[in-house]
Curated annotation (Swiss-Prot):
TM ranges: 33-53, 77-98, 113-133, 178-198, 226-246, 288-308, 320-340, 347-367
Gene Ontology CC: mitochondrial inner membrane; respiratory chain complex III
Pfam families given in the database record: Cytochrom_B_C, Cytochrome_B
Keyword field: Electron transport, Heme, Iron, Membrane, Metal-binding, Mitochondrion, Mitochondrion inner membrane, Respiratory chain, Transmembrane, Transmembrane helix, Transport, Ubiquinone
Record PANTHER family: CYTOCHROME B
Name listed for the protein in its UniProt record: Cytochrome b
UniProt-annotated location(s): Mitochondrion inner membrane
Residues noted as binding a ubiquinone in the record, renumbered to the chain: H201
Length: 379
């Protein structure tokens, strides 16, 4: 009798993706984040669906419907905070996943990498629109500031902003459409993640050495299924601690005040995971320049395959590139800190230096360091 998992049309897909998939024998815990992102996405879709059952996307009732979820719905507070902190965990896993790809040269799988960049944009758009939904002060003013950036686009900018707003300011129409987009985008993200995996399985996984692992493969199950389960348990532990002990740790107190178009909060800032991009946006005095820098701060990732000048794929055996990588990581942490600070001395200049360093490192210093390493090895 033939094995059903190897013959059944549906089971065969699952089998070839998660059971009999040949995987490199030496992939480290940095390869766990893909599965963790999948878990985060499922968690967000499930909690989001339950929240949508009780939420109303109307400016008059949105804030009170969220209060109602937290106070009156059975375990509503838990669902709401799982969803809010699940987004933070999602971005932590995303940053780790992208960082792993940058360090070990995974961007050389160009199709997989470019779909990953597209996924990053989609997740950022979804998170931004989700932050608007509770209709607190920071929701309203965040939506106003960020959508207003599109007015920097020459000629069509103003019309485009009013088209997105559905009027002359962020109002009922904006909230309703943001809710619609926030609901549909995660399913598009799930489909894109499927395509991401499809392209990954065309080439097989990369590994820490950056060398071909064709000579030494092991089956995904049980080796990496058990490893992914350990990662999942750690993720669940962290998110449980966050949700049950300090659910508002990563939030903004301003968002507990209902949206008021007549009162601007002293410091408008997005959620922590956007602060690095927000700092880059603010560090350029020109509006259009700032918007371009904001988009390029993520889009620059798509250029990495073109900027790879080293004859080795991974940074594992390249100490100079390793130092620059961790300098880039420290720079991003600096930008995140600056993004949450008021626009005053010395934060302005720190933000500008960190922003210039960010692009300078990726576009110029790292490719040059790779060429130097090639020469040092007399390649």
């Amino acid at each position: 009798m033939t094995n059903m998992r190897k013959t059944h049309p549906l089971m065969k897909i699952i089998n070839n993706s998660f059971i009999d998939l040949p995987a490199p024998s030496n992939i480290s815990s940095w390869w766990n984040f893909g599965s963790l992102l999948g878990i985060c996405l499922v968690l967000q879709i499930i909690t989001g669906m339950f929240l949508a059952m009780h939420y109303t996307s109307d400016t008059m009732t949105a804030f009170s419907s969220v209060t109602h979820i937290c106070r009156d719905v059975n375990y509503g507070w838990l669902i709401r905070y799982l969803h809010a902190n699940g987004a933070s965990m999602f971005f932590i896993c995303l940053f780790m996943h992208v960082g792993r790809g940058l360090y070990y040269g995974s961007y050389m799988f160009t199709e997989t990498w470019n779909i990953g960049v597209l996924l990053l944009f989609a997740v950022m758009a979804t998170a931004f629109m989700g932050y608007v939904l509770p209709w607190g002060q920071m929701s309203f003013w965040g939506a106003t500031v960020i959508t207003n950036l599109l007015s920097a686009i020459p000629y069509i900018g103003t019309d485009l902003v009013e088209w997105i707003w559905g009027g002359f300011s962020v109002d009922k129409a904006t909230l309703t459409r943001f809710f619609a987009f926030h609901f549909i985008l995660p399913f598009i993200i799930a489909a894109l993640a499927g395509v991401h995996l499809l392209f990954l399985h065309e080439t097989g996984s990369n590994n820490p050495s950056g060398l071909s692992s064709d000579t030494d493969k092991i089956p995904f199950h049980p080796y990496y299924t058990i490893k992914d389960i350990l990662g999942a348990l750690i993720l669940i532990l962290i998110i449980s601690l966050l949700v049950l002990f300090s659910p508002d740790l990563l939030g903004d107190p301003d968002n507990y005040t209902p949206a008021n178009p007549l009162n601007t909060p002293p410091h408008i800032k997005p959620e922590w995971y956007f602060l690095f991009a927000y700092a880059i946006l603010r560090s350029i005095p020109n509006k259009l320049g700032g918007v371009l820098a904001l988009v390029l701060s993520i889009l620059v990732l798509a250029l990495l395959p073109l900027l790879h000048t080293s004859k080795q794929r991974s940074m594992m055996f390249r100490p100079l590139s390793q130092c620059l990588f961790w300098l880039l990581a420290a720079d991003l942490l600096t930008l995140t800190w600056i993004g949450g600070q008021p626009v005053e001395h010395p934060f302005i200049i720190i933000g500008q230096v960190a922003s210039v360093l960010y692009f300078f490192l990726i576009l110029i210093i790292m490719p040059l360091a790779s060429i130097m390493e090639n020469n040092m090895l007399k390649w």
